[in-house]
């Protein structure tokens, strides 16, 4: 208990010290980094008039490896063979992410394929052949980038020395594909592809403590406008993304824990709303070479 109080006291003193100090953002001398991550990923899909309330991935644990050089980063993740239900087929998950950070900007690209979900019926799991495919290309600009660095909290290639925050503005193109091969979600019995354009915005704030400990809180949101290529009808796609990152950013190595929730609504009509909920917990280690 005494150690806990001492730890909180030193964090508070470090926070007050860094607010007053006003130190700039440091760029590590070592430009190349290796990245190792463990991802606990929970994707839930809910569809109107389906045979399930919601379904989820059967393999929620991924491992990842990646790297970074200069302003460019990439990560590859693969699902480990641990299942929620051993009687059902394992989920198939593939995800590739890349990030690029020119001054004050963040460009993000991703491709993800998620096959085979399960849902619960009277404490038993049932397999469903739902497939979700998505690709995203987004850009976000930080209005206050002299003292605030998004990448310092999430990519760990900068060291932010002062508590600061910034408004974020940008946009995104998203291609979302949904298919229920076994017709458990009848509306998606035929594959539906939705190209989506969305303005994006939010706010992010990083609290800096002593010894390069940090805490970042971020809230992003967007209102997307999509087109269902199968029915030629417009789809309203609002999305909210709260994020939290906590970690330590040293000169040769760094680590963080990131919690993120991504909630997407698909408004096909006033009475027809489906949803995709993606919650993840990531532990990232970065070694600068």
How should each PLM-predicted stretch be described?
Residues 21-84:
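Short glycine/proline- and aromatic-enriched beta-strand/turn motifs that initiate or cap beta-hairpins
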Residues 93-194, 260:
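Outer-membrane pore/translocation modules
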Residues 38-46, 69-73, 78-84, 102, ...:
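Transmembrane beta-strands of outer-membrane beta-barrel pores
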Residues 136-143, 277-289:
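Outer-membrane beta-barrel "beta-signal"
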Residues 42-44, 173-252, 263-264:
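Outer-membrane beta-barrel transmembrane domain signature
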Residues 44-52, 87-91, 119-124, 151-153, ...:
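Outer-membrane beta-barrel translocator domains and adjoining extracellular loop/strand segments
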Residues 28-34, 61, 70-74, 103-107, ...:
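Outer-envelope beta-barrel architecture signal
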């Amino acid at each position: 208990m005494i150690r806990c109080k001492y730890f909180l006291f030193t964090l508070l003193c470090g926070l007050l010290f860094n607010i007053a100090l006003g130190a700039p953002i440091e760029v590590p001398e070592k430009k190349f980094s290796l990245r190792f991550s463990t991802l606990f990923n929970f994707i839930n899909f809910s569809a109107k008039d389906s045979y399930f309330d919601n379904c989820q991935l059967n393999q929620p644990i991924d491992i990842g490896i990646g790297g970074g050089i200069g302003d460019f980063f990439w990560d590859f993740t693969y699902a480990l063979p641990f299942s929620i239900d051993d009687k059902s087929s394992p989920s198939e998950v593939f995800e590739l992410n890349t990030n690029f950070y020119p001054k004050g900007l963040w460009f993000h690209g991703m491709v993800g394929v998620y096959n085979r979900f399960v849902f619960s019926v009277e404490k038993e799991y049932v397999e469903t052949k739902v497939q979700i495919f998505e690709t995203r290309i987004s850009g976000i600009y930080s209005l206050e980038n002299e003292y605030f660095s998004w990448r310092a909290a999430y990519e760990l290639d900068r060291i932010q020395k002062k508590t600061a925050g910034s408004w974020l503005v940008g946009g995104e193109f998203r291609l979302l594909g949904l298919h229920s091969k076994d017709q458990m979600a009848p509306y998606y019995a035929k594959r539906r592809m939705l190209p989506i354009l969305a303005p994006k915005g939010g706010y992010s704030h990083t609290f800096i403590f002593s010894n390069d400990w940090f805490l970042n809180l971020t809230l992003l949101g967007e209102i997307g406008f999509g087109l269902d290529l199968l029915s030629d009808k417009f789809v309203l796609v609002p999305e909210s993304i709260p994020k939290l990152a906590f970690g330590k950013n040293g000169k040769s190595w760094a680590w963080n824990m990131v919690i993120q929730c991504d909630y997407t609504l698909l408004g096909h009509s006033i009475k027809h709303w489906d949803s995709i909920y993606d919650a993840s917990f990531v532990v990232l280690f970065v070694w600068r070479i």
